[in-house]
Every structure is written in C-alpha cells, then in structure tokens.
Amino acid sequence: FLADLISYKRILEQRNALLKMNYKKPKLDMGVLEIYDEKIIDLGNIIHEKRKLFIDIYKKIFKSYYVLISENKESVEINFKSQLNNNNYKDLIKDSLERDLIFQFTTQGPHKDDLELLLNGYQIKKFGSQGQQKSLLISLKLAQYEFLKKKLDIKPIVLLDDIFDKLDQKRVEL
C-alpha cells in the first residue's frame, strides 16, 4: 500500500506541475497529461480499494472499543468519504479537466478522501463534548494497536499523553 501511495503522490505532484505550467503558458501537451492520468487512475483505484478493505476491518475493532468505553450508551460510526465510492475515477478525471486547469491542481481523487466520525448520528468534531472526543481518540488508538498486533504479529508501543484529561470519572475507571 505504501509504495502505491508514494507513487500516486509523486504522479499527482507531476500532474499538478503540468497543470500549473499550462496556466502560465497555455500549451498543454495532452499526450503527457494522458500518461499521467492513466497512471494516476490505476494507482488511485488500487489505493481506494485497499482503503475500503482496511476501513471495513478497522471500524469493527474501533466500535468494540468505543462501546466498552462509553458503556454502550452512545453509537459511533466511521464513514469513508471518497469521490470514488460511487464514481468511476477515469470519468471523474476526464470530467474535471477544465476545472483542474482553472484551479491548477487535481480536484478529484483519493487524495481528497476523508473519514467522517459520527456520534449518535452527528459529526463528533462539531457536536461531541471534549470527553466524547477524547473517548473516540482513545478508541481509535486502541483499535490501531489491535489491528497492528494482529496484522503484523507484534505488540506495538502506544504512547498516550494526558489520557485521562477531559474524561468523566466513569470513563476513567473503565
């Protein structure tokens, strides 16, 4: 995954540089752009699929920790937000070319992916208390630990600074 991500970022930078050059001297070499697009589409699709698989596994582990910390009083969700979820990347790249030329960077792709964290159906970053946000962060870290432990058959070291700050007494005791 890491090699694909590094290659994707390198090609993305090259594509963006070409888009910027075209803005200064409008003579875009479509042949070069098509080569970049072909590579970025292939790698983008691979990255997207690997992220989807990871999130499907990770969210189950994460939820189990959050249920434990919150004593099953709150529901939590992780949603993988990606332009590629319901779209063909080749079509997205093709359809966004004019916009990319105006903005001078690639506006569509897995580099725009994000995770949405919901607590009882609401975005936790907007509506969660500091204690709820801290509980979510602890659950994320514990899920990372468990995932790495199972996947790599190692015991990772987890550093948590001020772990009990902003937590109510019940959550601290758990």
Regions found by a protein language model. Give the residues of each.
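Extended, charged alpha-helical "arm/stalk" segments used for dimerization and assembly
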Residues: F1-L19
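Amphipathic alpha-helical interaction surfaces
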Residues: L18-M21, L68
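Conserved NTPase motor "head" modules and their coupling/switch loops across ABC/AAA+ ATPases, GTPases
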Residues: K25-L159, K166-L174
